[in-house]
Amino acid sequence: MKKHRIFKRILIVFLCLAIVGVTSLFIINGYVKSSGKDRILTVEKAAELDDVDCIIVLGCQIKDDGSLSHMLRDRLMRGLEVYEAGAAPKLLMSGDHGREDYDEVGAMKNYAIENGVPSENVFMDHAGFSTYETVYRAKEIFEADKVIIVTQEYHLYRALYIAKQLGVDAYGVSSDLNTYAGQSMRDFREVLARCKDWVMCIFIPEPTYLGEAIPVSGNGDLTND
């Protein structure tokens, strides 16, 4: 009987902790989403902004043969649309190039050049391993204080929240040009990612790599391999 009471109390404690945890997830998720809603603009409205340093296109997975995924292609198409509208003079491609045989940013820059953007106007952040690291490095390495971030809308909320917490004046343009397979799972993972980056923005850890400044006002070819 005594063991039964102890088990019951333990179960109640775990249930209470679970309720608190789930409630916290939803509160933080809602807070992160709401903090950047008014900074998501159309291409036309983004082009009306003044003194934007660069357009940041956030990377995502490329295929085994190095070609672009549908999601990444849409980000690049929208990023180039914002660039061609005159919203900013430079593009910053940020993604994962942590291995010699996997290069998101190289594929992204090649796409921009193939579509008429001068190579010197396209910067690459080879160590943009996460959204948090991308925004941190945009400010500290590329000296970008005012930016337009391009990615799918579900991802924009978190990127804009991080930018706000790190002191970057950021606006977003959505690249939802299609529907994407597996989006329900991405939406679920994004809830957890928002909570993780909410914590990151409290402690402000340094990214995996820092280094010498490469001002985005200069020549993007300085970031070539």
Language-model features: where?
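A general structural signal for short secondary-structure boundary/capping elements
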Residues: 99-104, 171, 193-200, 217-222
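N-terminal type II signal-anchor transmembrane helix
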Residues: 2-45
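Enrichment for repetitive, rod-forming helical segments
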Residues: 15-16, 82, 203
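A transmembrane-helix-recognition feature enriched in membrane-embedded lipid enzymes
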Residues: 187-209
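Short linear elements at protein peripheries
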Residues: 207-225
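A structural signal for short, hydrophobic/glycine-enriched beta-strand patches
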Residues: 28-188
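Short, Lys/Arg-enriched, disordered terminal segments
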Residues: 1-10, 87, 220-225
